Regions:
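Class I SAM-dependent methyltransferase SAM-binding "motif I" and its flanking Rossmann-like core
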Residues: 131, 135-176
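Ligand-binding beta-strand-loop-alpha-helix segment within the catalytic cores
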Residues: 51-123
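Short glycine-rich anion-binding loops that position phosphate/pyrophosphate groups of nucleotides
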Residues: 33-34, 64, 128-133, 139
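Generic structural signal for well-ordered alpha-helical scaffold segments
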Residues: 12-20, 43, 47, 80-84, ...
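N-terminal glycine-/serine-/threonine-rich phosphate-binding loop
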Residues: 1-27
């Protein structure tokens, strides 16, 4: 891609083709700065009548542990603000890991089951973090893992503190993430 706008448009083209070819597809979605332009393009095409999200299911890549869906730093909030509130997707078919579940193993197991019940992910949108992380999976992480908890590295905390009032507000020590499409 020539630049961010071109990359965003190309990614949106791939996603829209998936939705058109399989209206009841399962999209794996990402958060952060990488996909924002893609979501803006998808919203624009939806508003023009070119896309219909009514049968789409989504599963998000990750979530901070300890943040409620209403917290403006949660990835559920991010997805609502940057995509779901602007298209005709059925929010009961949009899934983000449960950041409020106290039992991390239970939260991971439940999210894995949600993904399995959807039949896996048809298309996964990913973004790359400043150090090459995908989701909260740092470089060198095993890609065959299902949903699991990870400790945020200091470099990821440093990069993500810009989204919070202070570095101390960045949720620790773990966050939920998955890469495997089941």
């Amino acid at each position: 891609a020539k630049d961010y706008q071109d990359m965003s448009r190309k990614a949106a083209n791939i996603i829209s083709a998936q939705i058109i070819m399989k209206p009841n597809c399962v999209l794996g979605l990402a958060t952060g700065s990488s996909p924002v332009g893609t979501y803006k393009q998808l919203i624009e095409w939806y508003k023009k009548g070119d896309l219909d999200f009514s049968q789409v299911t989504s599963v998000n890549l990750d979530e901070y542990k300890g943040l409620s869906p209403e917290n403006d730093q949660s990835y559920r909030y991010f997805m609502n603000t940057n995509l779901f509130d602007h298209v005709n997707i059925d929010k009961t078919r949009t899934f983000v890991p449960n950041g409020l579940e106290a039992d991390s193993d239970k939260a991971c197991s439940e999210y894995n089951e949600i993904i399995r019940k959807q039949g896996g992910v048809d298309l996964q949108l990913l973004g790359l973090g400043h150090n090459g992380h995908i989701g909260f999976n740092e470089p060198g992480a095993a890609f065959e893992k299902e949903t699991h908890c990870v400790d945020l590295t200091e470099s990821t905390i440093e990069a993500n503190k810009r989204f919070f009032e202070s570095e101390d507000d960045v949720p620790r020590p773990v966050s939920y993430t998955h890469l495997r499409a089941h």
